[in-house]
């Protein structure tokens, strides 16, 4: 995956993980999974509900947070320069 893709994914998933936000994850086959994001890496998301499931990112269509989440995609140098 390109570095540009990580600039959106990582801060978003990290905010969901840090704040223990309940999420609905829709898979490409239409199945809906619910829980909290426990961890993630380049290829998978660990979703915790009654059990922890490893969900491959290529199978994910949409992640819907249960509430609004604030996350920043600005790099520290960009934030300081006002860009």
Swiss-Prot record:
InterPro entries: Hfq (IPR005001), LSM_dom_sf (IPR010920), Sm (IPR047575). Keywords: RNA-binding, Stress response. CDD domains: Hfq (cd01716). It holds the Pfam family Hfq. GO terms for cellular component: cytosol. Belongs to the Hfq family. RNA chaperone that binds small regulatory RNA (sRNAs) and mRNAs to facilitate mRNA translational regulation in response to envelope stress, environmental stress and changes in metabolite concentrations. Also binds with high specificity to tRNAs. This is RNA-binding protein Hfq. It comes from Paracidovorax citrulli (strain AAC00-1) (Acidovorax citrulli).
């Amino acid at each position: 995956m390109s570095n540009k893709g990580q600039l959106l994914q990582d801060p978003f998933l990290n905010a969901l993980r840090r704040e223990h936000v309940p999420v609905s994850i829709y898979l490409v086959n239409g199945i809906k999974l619910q829980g909290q994001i426990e961890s993630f890496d380049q290829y998978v998301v660990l979703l915790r509900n009654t059990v922890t499931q490893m969900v491959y990112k290529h199978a994910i269509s949409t992640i819907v947070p249960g509430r609004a989440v604030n996350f920043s995609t600005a790099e520290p140098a960009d934030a300081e320069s006002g860009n």
